[in-house]
């Protein structure tokens, strides 16, 4: 009986660790983006346009799990729309010099309580290669795990 219990716990722990690794790889995949400069008539200057590789395109419209940090956009502790970052607030794209590929817009099913600790979110990944007023990644129908 002890051997069966030990075997079960070993398998459960291995599965948990392998799933955690997969979840953390989402940002790594999303970071494999390149940019090209194009002139924008509305802004009157050249801007960076994202070029999504096949690995990123394969995630478009798919359910993904991402570990990161909530960056509130309103003064509320419970939000349905916010920015999610691969890095803590002081190191994020808006505050610390990381690239735009390290953040995403989040639209959640129900309000998610703010925390400064990292959290896992699951949702449908959308790619944005054309609207300069939005982030390049959006996580729709997100829920906290």
Language model: regions and residue ranges:
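Sec-dependent N-terminal signal peptides
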Residues: 4-13
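Sec/Tat signal peptide C-region and signal peptidase I cleavage site
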Residues: 14-18
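OB-fold and OB-like single-stranded nucleic-acid-recognition modules
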Residues: 19-145
């Amino acid at each position: 009986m002890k051997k069966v219990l030990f075997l079960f716990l070993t398998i459960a722990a291995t599965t948990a660790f392998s799933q955690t690794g997969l979840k953390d790889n989402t940002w790594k995949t999303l970071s494999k983006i390149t940019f090209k400069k194009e002139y924008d008539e509305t802004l009157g200057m050249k801007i960076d346009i994202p070029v999504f590789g096949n690995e990123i395109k394969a995630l478009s419209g798919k359910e993904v799990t991402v570990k990161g940090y909530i960056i509130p956009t309103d003064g509320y502790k419970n939000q349905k729309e916010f920015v999610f970052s691969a890095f803590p607030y002081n190191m994020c794209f808006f505050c610390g010099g990381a690239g735009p590929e390290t953040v995403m817009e989040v639209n959640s099913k129900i309000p998610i309580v703010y925390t400064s600790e990292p959290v896992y979110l699951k949702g449908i990944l959308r790619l944005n290669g054309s609207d300069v007023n939005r982030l390049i990644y959006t996580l729709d129908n997100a829920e906290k795990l």
